[in-house]
């Protein structure tokens, strides 16, 4: 018997379905089901995933949606043609616009207005008067396209209920059709289905009651079983295929039209693009286009004409032109930097005359995929660009892509644990022991937490959390991926309001958009561009120099000397500990060295075993040999090692005779070979082509294995070059203007890898004077103050460093102060009219000390004497006299002041940093008594020496390709130390590694040149030692930068992972690995 299941809910219904489209379609194929109708509730968010599953399994997808109306009526709708699909997407858009984020409000009148061309299937409850009224309405609205669902509920009166619904349907001439209301692909998912129901209703399994599914039959059944269950309703069974035949629409029919751009009068898009290219060329090449660049430009323009991509280039050009007209720093990156056309138009900054670009990496005729140009803007001004796009293209034709927020380990543990009723402390203990997003918790670790792994609920929590990981939780908004259309965008996909004001998103993410070959424009935010813009402003204001990205001195010797010393904290791309480890070995001296540096600390070159050969050849320890001059021409700059994606493509083209398009297909197949195995079809062509061109079979095989190893992670050279430009500029500013760099970096927070405490500490080491927050001198941003008798400047910390202080309150303080400093707390309160809460925040940040000489407790005592607001009589007098008039005189009180240690903790608590002593300095006597030496002494010890040191934990890194090895950075008053923890020790001391604010390490020094590590043998938690600093029973909280993935969350699927940290800064960054397990190559100096 043939059967199609028309009522299938995937997990893209968000906490309703418990299986993915892939699982459902694969199961359907195994069971012999001919078609699947996906009907997620009020949403088409998962329909493209269903299309991809349909393509993979060759099971027909029927596009549909379940509409839950405000009057309680539920309806399955299926568009029969392309026009009906557009009406469905507009209908959902209408409901989302009323309901807002994660809600959809639709009425029956809306359905009537948009129902033409749709099949409607009523989902009835009981065969009562309400059901009869609903049948009458659906018959009138849908005519012969009206059906009613027959679905078992596993109740005693099931057969009677079906019989009565069938009779009612006959009375209103509505046809019946069998559905199974599928929520999961196989019976084993029933438990997870109950759990997601509990999560959705914010309740526990003990209290969920009848909200959970009342039976376990909501899984896919084979046609034979459906025939047995509905033996009395053979016609209704047959109608499942009838509906499939009537629904001729397929998502493959969606044809995307790019918007027509504002073009040169009388010219089409291609002619306009060429006009702008030749018009802009003199700006880039005042002395005329070099012949090789001219040839490249003509080749690119021909390919753009063939692919009809001119409107896309014009769009990006217009966006960049708008940003520059507003003084917003921006720069294109990614594969687009391979384009000479993009360079001439000012979209990217990589000069094709000095860099060997490969346009096929960007646009390829064989690949037939839309181009993807990523443009970075200052992160604090990107919203101006976004709103300009909405204004220019209108909200009918422009929206951001969605991102799918998925469950990760911690979020899954928390939600499943709550649903199963575990105590909060148990949930917290479990989740705090999780490192990676998919990590399992061994029984031994559970016992270390004083929990019983044999407890049924605990075991079930871990089992179901594993099943929940990766499941969608809700939709968020893409950082800046815009989809723009010629016609209405909601003809293609439903649109919903974003959480942020004046933004809207489509229901599909970037992968869905790519699957349907839509073009998107990426308007991305880059914090370092904000930092650079603010740095240029400060240099202009205080140094009298006009600097920007285009006129910074190139190849500056002092800048490269600083980079070679790995003195790059806070700079762009080469600031991480892994990058710092490579810098003393690679020793960059030119811009191209910096390009290599950016790209080499990635999993790709490491997995392809390219890092060590490159370094050995660079150091002269290994000869550089090229079998042919052609290969030397391709790999000469990288010493015979294919470090970049473009290198791999050029090797295939030059050595094996691949076309540009074939080489790009090779790159893409390598990127997915672990999942598709598609690379094998290229291996024979590559190896045989190289042998044919005179290379030995052994060399050809070695070349292929190298490319295969790094293909999935290889970095485009053009992308590395774009990033290297900003990396160089940031290092130049840090080298020559360290005071400016510190202030600009603090004013651009949150961004980057490091917390303000590390940024300020590094600036002080570079001789920058940093002054505390002051109620009479600080502004919102950090500023520069000239040092008396010198041409140097000090950095004055701004009010932005004070935690909890509102921008509006800070603005009122600055405006009231003008050129007349506040004389007292009372004076400040009256003249600024800020609430006392703002004064308390400033007092806790010690902002009254620098100018008013009030210690924390004195300032707080003075604030206690203030009213909620000044009395009108005194306020009027103060305004008339232009000075504060006290309401009453407070007697002087001698308060006991805080200890130095207590002040340090208060500094960290309220400003995130301290200008006093390092916290560990207060513990040095006790540590020395335990034979614990300073970090600097440990890092200067000879190779092989056993040392015992301790410090605050700043960074934890566990690179994905490091096979479980963890790298930890600690710090004391003498500087940082770099710790290596082997997997066995990590598992034994997991709670210490993941939970310590301060850690002691006993281990052996490993040294190779300037690269030094302490390989841990024993780990001890010294967090309790920090408690005594403030003479109180609260833990010390070390502020963490945004790179802190363990404490802040990893930008991962479950946004609720981002809880306030009670542990120090840790992170998980898979792309920061250098030498797999050869730890001598890492340097955290």
Swiss-Prot record:
Instruction: Report the main location listed first in the record.
Output: cytoplasm
Q: Which InterPro entries match?
A: DNA_pol3_alpha_NTPase_dom (IPR011708), DNA_pol3_finger (IPR040982), DnaE2 (IPR023073), DnaE2/DnaE/PolC (IPR004805), DNAPol_HHH (IPR029460), NA-bd_OB_tRNA (IPR004365), PHP_dom (IPR004013), Pol/His_phosphatase_N (IPR003141)
Quote the function comment for this protein.
DNA polymerase involved in damage-induced mutagenesis and translesion synthesis (TLS). It is not the major replicative DNA polymerase.
Instruction: List the HAMAP family.
Output: DNApol_error_prone (MF_01902)
Give the location in the cell: Cytoplasm
Identify the EC number(s).
Answer: 2.7.7.7
Q: Which protein, by its recorded name, is this?
A: Error-prone DNA polymerase 2
Q: What family, per the record?
A: Belongs to the DNA polymerase type-C family. DnaE2 subfamily.
This protein's UniProt keywords: Cytoplasm, DNA damage, DNA repair, DNA replication, DNA-directed DNA polymerase, Nucleotidyltransferase, Plasmid, Transferase
Where are the stretches annotated Disordered?
Answer: 1040-1066
| Segments traversing the membrane | none
- Return the GO cellular component terms, semicolon-separated: cytoplasm
SMART domains reported in the protein's UniProt record: POLIIIAc
One GO term under biological process is: DNA repair
What GO annotations for molecular function exist for this entry?
3'-5' exonuclease activity; DNA-directed DNA polymerase activity; nucleic acid binding
Q: Its domain of life?
A: Bacteria
- Catalysed conversion reaction: DNA(n) + a 2'-deoxyribonucleoside 5'-triphosphate = DNA(n+1) + diphosphate
């Amino acid at each position: 018997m043939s059967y199609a299941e028309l009522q299938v809910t995937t997990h893209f219904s968000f906490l309703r379905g418990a299986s993915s489209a892939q699982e459902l379609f694969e199961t359907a194929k195994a069971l012999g089901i001919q078609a699947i109708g996906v009907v997620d509730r009020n949403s088409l968010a998962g329909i493209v995933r269903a299309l991809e599953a349909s393509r993979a399994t060759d099971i027909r997808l029927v596009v549909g949606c379940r509409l839950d109306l405000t009057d309680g009526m539920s309806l399955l709708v299926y568009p029969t043609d392309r026009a009906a699909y557009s009406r469905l997407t507009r209908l959902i858009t209408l409901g989302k616009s009323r309901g807002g984020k994660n809600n959809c409000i639709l009425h029956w009148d809306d359905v009537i207005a948009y129902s033409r061309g749709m099949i409607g299937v009523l989902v009835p409850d009981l065969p009562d008067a309400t059901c009869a009224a609903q049948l009458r309405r659906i018959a009138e609205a849908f005519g012969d396209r009206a059906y009613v669902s027959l679905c078992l509920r596993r109740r005693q009166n099931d057969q009677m209920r079906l019989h009565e619904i069938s009779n009612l349907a006959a009375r209103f001439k509505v046809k019946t059709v069998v559905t199974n209301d599928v929520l999961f692909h196989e019976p084993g998912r029933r438990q997870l289905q109950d759990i997601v129901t509990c999560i959705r209703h914010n309740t526990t399994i003990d209290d969920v009651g009848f909200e959970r599914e009342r039976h376990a039959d909501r899984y896919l059944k084979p046609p034979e079983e459906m025939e047995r269950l509905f033996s009395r309703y053979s016609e209704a069974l047959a109608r499942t295929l009838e509906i499939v035949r009537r629904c001729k629409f397929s998502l493959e029919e969606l044809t995307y039209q790019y918007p027509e751009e504002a073009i040169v009068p009388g010219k089409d898009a291609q002619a306009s693009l060429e006009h702008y290219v030749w018009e802009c060329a003199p700006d880039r090449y005042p002395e005329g286009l070099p012949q090789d660049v001219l040839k490249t430009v003509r080749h690119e323009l021909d390919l753009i004409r063939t692919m009809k991509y001119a409107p896309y280039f014009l769009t990006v050009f217009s966006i960049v032109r708008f940003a520059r007209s507003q003084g917003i720093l921006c720069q294109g990156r990614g594969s687009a930097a391979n384009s000479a056309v993009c360079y001439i138009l000012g979209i990217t900054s990589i000069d094709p005359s000095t860099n060997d670009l490969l346009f096929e990496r960007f646009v390829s005729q064989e690949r037939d995929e839309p181009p993807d140009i990523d443009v970075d803007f200052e992160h604090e001004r990107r919203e101006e660009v976004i709103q300009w796009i909405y204004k220019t293209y209108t909200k009918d034709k422009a929206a951001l892509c969605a991102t799918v927020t998925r469950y990760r380990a911690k979020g899954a543990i928390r939600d499943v644990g709550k649903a199963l009723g575990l105590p909060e402390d148990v949930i917290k203990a479990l989740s705090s022991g999780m490192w990676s997003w998919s990590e399992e918790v061994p029984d031994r670790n559970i016992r270390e937490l004083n929990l019983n792994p044999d407890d049924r609920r605990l075991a079930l929590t871990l089992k179901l959390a594993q099943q929940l990981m990766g499941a969608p939780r809700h939709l968020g908004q893409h950082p800046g991926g815009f989809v723009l259309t010629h016609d209405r965008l909601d003809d293609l996909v439903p649109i919903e309001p974003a959480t942020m004001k004046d933004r809207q998103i489509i229901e599909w993410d970037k992968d869905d958009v790519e699957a349907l070959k839509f073009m998107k424009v990426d308007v991305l935010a880059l914090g370092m561009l904000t930092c650079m813009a603010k740095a240029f402003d400060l240099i202009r204001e205080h140094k009298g120099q006009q600097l920007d990205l285009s006129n910074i001195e190139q190849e500056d010797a002092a800048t490269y000397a600083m980079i070679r010393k790995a003195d790059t904290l806070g700079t762009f791309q080469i600031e991480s500990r892994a990058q710092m480890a490579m810098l003393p070995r690679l020793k960059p001296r030119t811009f191209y060295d910096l390009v290599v540096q950016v790209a080499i600390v990635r999993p790709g070159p490491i997995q392809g075993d390219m890092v060590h050969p490159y370094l050995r050849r660079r150091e002269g320890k290994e000869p550089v040999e090229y079998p042919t001059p052609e290969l030397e021409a391709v790999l000469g700059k990288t010493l015979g090692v294919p470090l970049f994606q473009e290198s791999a493509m050029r090797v295939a083209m030059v050595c094996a005779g691949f076309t540009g398009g074939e080489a790009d297909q090779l790159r893409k197949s390598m990127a997915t070979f672990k999942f598709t195995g598609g690379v094998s079809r290229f291996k024979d062509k590559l190896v045989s082509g190289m042998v044919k061109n005179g290379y030995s079979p052994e060399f050809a095989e070695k070349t292929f294995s190298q490319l295969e190893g790094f293909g999935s992670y290889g970095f485009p050279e053009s992308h590395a070059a774009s990033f290297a430009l900003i990396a160089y500029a940031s290092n130049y500013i840090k080298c020559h203007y360290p005071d400016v760099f510190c202030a600009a970096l603090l004013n651009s927070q949150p961004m980057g890898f490091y917390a303000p405490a590390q940024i300020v500490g590094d600036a002080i080491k570079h001789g920058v004077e940093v002054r505390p927050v002051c109620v009479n001198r600080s502004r919102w941003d950090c500023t520069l103050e000239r040092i008396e008798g010198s041409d140097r400047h000090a950095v004055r910390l701004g009010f932005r460093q004070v935690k909890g202080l509102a921008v509006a309150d800070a603005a009122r303080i600055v405006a009231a102060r003008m050129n007349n400093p506040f004389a007292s707390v009372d004076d400040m309160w009256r003249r600024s009219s800020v609430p006392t809460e703002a004064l308390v925040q400033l007092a806790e940040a010690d902002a009254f000390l620098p100018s008013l000489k009030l210690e924390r407790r004195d300032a707080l005592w003075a604030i206690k004497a203030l009213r909620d607001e000044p009395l009108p009589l005194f306020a009027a007098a103060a305004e008339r006299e232009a000075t504060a008039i006290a309401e009453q005189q407070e007697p002087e009180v001698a308060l006991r002041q805080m200890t130095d240690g207590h002040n340090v903790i208060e500094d960290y608590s309220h400003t995130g940093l301290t200008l006093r002593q390092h916290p560990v300095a207060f513990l040095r006597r006790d540590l020395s008594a335990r034979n614990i030496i300073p970090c600097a002494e440990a890092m200067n010890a000879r190779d092989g020496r056993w040392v015992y040191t301790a410090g605050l934990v700043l960074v934890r890194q566990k690179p994905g390709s490091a096979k479980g090895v963890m790298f930890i950075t600690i710090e004391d008053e003498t500087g940082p130390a770099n710790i290596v923890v082997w997997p066995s020790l990590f598992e034994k001391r997991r709670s210490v590694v993941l939970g310590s604010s301060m850690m002691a390490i006993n281990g052996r020094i490993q040294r190779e040149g300037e690269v030094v590590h302490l390989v841990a043998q024993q780990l001890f938690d010294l967090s309790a030692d920090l408690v005594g600093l403030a003479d109180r029973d609260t833990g010390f909280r070390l502020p963490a930068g945004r790179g802190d993935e363990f404490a802040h969350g990893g930008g991962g699927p479950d946004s609720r992972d981002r809880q306030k940290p009670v542990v120090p800064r840790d992170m998980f960054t898979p792309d920061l690995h250098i030498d797999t397990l050869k730890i001598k190559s890492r340097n955290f100096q």
